[in-house]
């Protein structure tokens, strides 16, 4: 079963002389458990595609479905909830909240959903990412690699159907 399907996805910015086509007719199918890497030159549309696949932005044309849900049909609030529950996003810049501890940053998606964490799974995630001893640290007390691992843990903590990582 396809967990992700892209059909003819296009993204255009601007109009007239300022029109820029970032994506043109992208077709992609990804099965559950499959690993796919999108590579290309700087400015080739990789991050734009990631934002569309992650329900952060909408395509100008075409269709994207995740687990059978057509992302274009989601209103802003629905998209935010869908993204939080179904799509793990790890950005090139970690987007950690500087005033929250590592633990609270990791648990943020569950907190927003008013869900209790599965403590055993939480321990498994932080241990596997080497963060067990840093849970009370603030992001500015971590190395860049540790901050990236916190962002990965935050994306994994709610067991998303799809994990997307930008660089």
Give the positions of each predicted feature.
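ABC family nucleotide-binding domain
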Residues: 2-167
